[in-house]
Amino acid sequence: MKPSLIIVTFIVVFMTISCVAADDEQETWIEKRGDCLPHLKRCKENNDCCSKKCKRRGANPEKRCR
């Protein structure tokens, strides 16, 4: 085998592994962000909301994220 073929193969394998790892990180980020619905999620404490703001809304005594 030629040394250049080995180098090209190594580069292709490295790029493939890098792309797969980047896709996994992106999916994890999307899952974390998808769990946050600020105007719909009920909260008991300020840290339950993604925006860190928990206030009473409307006449209902329950609190929702703002």
UniProtKB/Swiss-Prot annotation:
Residues 1-22 form the signal peptide. Pfam families: Toxin_27. Keywords: Calcium channel impairing toxin, Cleavage on pair of basic residues, Disulfide bond, Ion channel impairing toxin, Knottin, Neurotoxin, Ryanodine-sensitive calcium-release channel impairing toxin, Secreted, Signal, Toxin. Its main location: secreted. Expressed by the venom gland. Residues 55-57 are annotated as: Essential for stimulation of [3H]ryanodine binding to RYR1. The keyword Secreted applies. One of its GO terms (cellular component) is extracellular region. The keyword NADP does not apply. Residues 23-31 form a propeptide. One of its GO terms (molecular function) is toxin activity. Coiled coil: none annotated. Disulfide bonds join 36-50, 43-54, 49-65. Belongs to the scorpion calcin family. The presence of a 'disulfide through disulfide knot' structurally defines this protein as a knottin. This is Opicalcin-2.
